[in-house]
Curated annotation (Swiss-Prot):
PANTHER family: UPF0114 PROTEIN YQHA (PTHR38596:SF1). Belongs to the UPF0114 family. It is a multi-pass membrane protein. The chain crosses the membrane at residues 15-35, 53-73, 109-129, 136-156. Keywords: Cell membrane, Membrane, Transmembrane, Transmembrane helix. GO terms for cellular component: plasma membrane. The keyword DNA-binding does not apply. The keyword Cell membrane applies. It is found in: Cell membrane. This is UPF0114 protein Tola_1474. The lineage of its organism: Bacteria, Pseudomonadati, Pseudomonadota, Gammaproteobacteria, Aeromonadales. It holds the Pfam family UPF0114.
Length: 167
């Protein structure tokens, strides 16, 4: 009975496979939104103010950072929790594949979230005349929370690595 339960639990990891595959659809949706913004820029670029152009470009950077985050979570999550990707014979294999454990992935995700939040905060600061002061304070507080959380996770990870390594 115990062996059956253990095999069933181990096989349950495959439930995550369609979720990681679904992230590729989210990536496709993000790509469509990205190019929608690019095409929109070219239709109004002559009449657009410089600040508006910069805000749209920051949105494009934001989209690309989120896309990179999706790729990282999709591949690393699949490799860490479902199965190894058999890509040894591919010339274009990503150099970090197979090297990110769950802890490293967590730290990279946290760093990506801080970068995304930074871009969003920069957009807020460039558009302060249209945003209420209390909302700006909340955006800043949330960003500081992300930064502190990422720092704390990185520091704890370092402490654990130092504890596990021989001196």
């Amino acid at each position: 009975m115990e062996r059956f339960i253990e095999r069933l639990m181990y096989s349950a990891r495959w439930i995550m496979a369609p979720i990681y595959l679904g992230l590729s659809l989210a990536l496709l949706a993000l790509g469509i939104k990205f190019f929608q913004e690019v095409f929109h820029i070219f239709t109004v670029i002559i009449s657009m103010k410089e600040v508006e152009l910069i805000l749209i470009i920051l949105s494009l950077i934001d989209i690309s950072l989120v896309g990179g985050l999706i790729v990282m979570v999709m591949y690393s999550g699949y490799e860490n929790f479902v199965s190894r990707l058999d890509l040894d014979d591919h010339d274009d294999k990503l150099s970090w594949l197979g090297k990110l454990d769950a802890g490293s992935l967590k730290n990279k995700v946290a760093a990506s979230i801080v970068a995304i939040s930074s871009i969003h905060l920069l957009k807020v600061f460039m558009n302060t005349e249209n945003i209420a002061d209390d909302k700006i304070k909340w955006y800043l507080l949330i960003h500081i929370t992300f930064v502190m959380s990422a720092f704390a996770m990185g520091y704890l990870d370092k402490l654990l690595r130092d504890k596990d390594s021989p001196h």
